[in-house]
Amino acid sequence: MVTAMVLINVQRGQINETAQRLLEVDGVAEVYSVTGEYDLVALLRFQNYEDLASVVTSHMQQLPTITKTHTLMAFQCYSRADLQQAWDIGIV
């Protein structure tokens, strides 16, 4: 599984519309409105890098309300759910 976070800036007043349109794209799992330098953070999950690249370079760039993106690739996931499962089956 390939996971990426895309930090997104959008045109003024277009946060809600852009978030909804992003959620229509296959592979976009979640979209958050955030404070700070960026307006939205999209969490993307794909089976391969080619599909991720297609969404970031083609689909997202076709949305006229998106003015800037910055993509972060995830190397490893640390989560409470994973840790709890490890304890439950005696790995840890």
Question: Language model features by range: what are they?
Answer:
Residues 1-92:
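A compositional/biophysical signature of low hydrophobicity enriched in polar/charged and small residues
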